[in-house]
Amino acid sequence: MSATTETQTEKLTFRIYKDGEPQKFKRLQDNIFQASWSHKCPTYVQSTPPCQGSCPSGEDIRGYLNIVRGVEKPPVGADGKPVMPWQEYAWRRLTEANPLPAVMGRVCPAPCETGCNRNMVEDHVGINSVEHFLGEYAIANNLQFNKPSKLTGKKVAVLGGGPAGLSVAYQLSLKGHSVTIFDDHEFLGGMMRYGIPGYRTPRDVLDAEIQRILNLGVEVKLKCRVGTDISMDQINKDFDAVFLGLGAQGGRPLPVEGTENVSNIVTATSFLKAFNDGRLKHVGKRVVVVGGGDTSIDVATVARRLGHITTSKPTDWEGAIAGQMAQDVADISMRQGADVILTSVFPVDKMMASKPEIDHAQAEGIDIMGGWMPVAVIKDANNRATALRVCQCEAKMVGGRLEIKKIDGSEKDLPADLIVSAIGQSIDFTGLEVFNNGKGAISTDKAYAVQGKPGVYAGGDVIRPHLLTTAIGHGAIAADGIDQFLLGVEAGRRPKIDVHVFDLMRKLAEKGTTIGRISEPLCGTDTSKAAVHNYDNRSDRYVIAHDELFLGHFQYTPRNKRHITHLNKESALGNFEERLDPLDDKQVVGEAKRCMSCGLCFECDNCVVYCPQTAVYKVKKTESTTGRYVATDYDKCIGCHICRDVCPTGYIQMGLGE
């Protein structure tokens, strides 16, 4: 969940030019133009905003924010009225990349918000909260995806029904291919269902978004594992292509000796699965979690909510986690708080978990010990762990590898009834060993094609355990590769900036204002009727930075924040209610208006108002659309660069003529 607690209260001022240091005189002189000799005239350059460049799913974030704020309008019908509400239009733009916005709007750590240029003004745009709102709107209004007009007759097997598998199934179905998902669980969802607690991803929300994908005609075979229940050879015979979205639902044991066959030392994945299956309803009085990422936070907060039962036996929770039994639901009326400690080799401020989740965990009474590592397990005569011995350490990443240095003499024992290892995940390759690259993962190229296996693609945690949004992005890119393979088309090179972006040509066609034949090499001209006047799309190779914007245009505007139910040590016990409420219509529009539309015109009129030669003018309404709002009369333009200086979004660049 992205719910940053920090607020920028200092109002800032901005300058385009800084005091000139000697080494910068030449560069600054280059920006001083005179009417008699300047040859630099404005061109309109579409760039990718850093929010989209930071989004692993590749969402057109700027696009749906511009729709929500009213800059980009839905298409109109013959009666002159919009064919759909702005909420639906924004949702459809969002779901071109991500079919699970209601889920991701709740649990995604939102790297897009970290990259947001608005951070240089006062605070990031609440992108995650807008996504949450649109996902909720779609469920409430039963919005469905549009089925393809025709089918290709090609069949694709998707192994695994987690975020990667659902993403590729969705994208392939839209392309007209028949998809069958094989999953060895009772329900689809992968880690969204069996890893993340239900109070973070409500099951009715998850079910609704999964069902919408299945409504495209996707077939499902549950409790069926390829490699054991059905052979890979049979899959290859029955299907034209295969996607491996196996996930990484196995846990990694503690990296200390003596943990084998110790019943009260478990992995995070088995702990969370037992909880999400409904088998685990209480734990021991003292729980120690070893980790530092978001999964370890989930384990710790679940343990805090479950609490312990004084009359229970250790075998009760151990058997539930092992899948051997389910605890008696009647016992939960007697639950008491559990003491939960979470250890991490990194200091708390450098932990991999998102800061808001760390803050919530600490508020709920979880003791987070940063800079500690496990060194030994203390066991009794029955081979049960009674404590975890830890010592202080210094950890850092060197060349992509974790290096940990123990601090001698700092050891201490943490008494524990249950120890949970949340230090990583592993992949079960049973029956599919041929795909194991020897490092417990699958090797692919940049299009996620499995090396040496034509027609086989992979994505998600089988490549590298990462975020849910990363798995969704893998699925979308793999779907493009599978589609090209099935159609016999040679796979093209993926763009440098591989995300969904605003498509001006599509928007012109949508409005019915396409001028002649579209020809990319001519897009920068002002004479050809087959091109858009002085426009260049560099979205596939360029992310625009904050120092290319006119930040002084943007007034200090606090972020519209979602309401979060904050729990303490007492109120967390037994509380499994969702704690995050979506924004309402007014709030979400207000939040979208904070977007600076980096790299694309948002129709502020600054360039028209401030041009001293009236060279910049508005395009006729019958020919204009988003991204084609203004143009330049080069017979009047003197190259003074004022239009560029006052362009808030960095859409205008003084490059034409160079």
Q: What is each stretch, according to the model?
A:
Residues L222-N236, G371-N383, E394-A395:
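A conserved short coil-to-beta-strand element within the FAD-binding core of flavoproteins
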Residues G217, F239, V262, G284-K285, ...:
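Short, well-ordered alpha-helix to beta-strand connector turns
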Residues E136-L143, K223-V226, T267-A274, V398-K406, ...:
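Short gly/ser/thr-rich secondary-structure transition/capping motifs
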Residues R27, E59-P82, W91-R93, M120, ...:
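Beta1-alpha1 glycine-rich phosphate/pyrophosphate-binding loop at the start
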Residues P253-E257, G399-K406, T430-F435:
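Glycine/threonine-rich flexible loop motifs
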Residues V158-F182, L222-S231, G250, S270-K355, ...:
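Rossmann-like dinucleotide/flavin-binding elements
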Residues M1-K155, R203, V242-N261, T269, ...:
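Ferredoxin-type iron-sulfur electron-transfer modules and their immediate structural context
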Residues T386-E403:
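Active-site rim loops that border cofactor/substrate pockets in soluble metabolic enzymes
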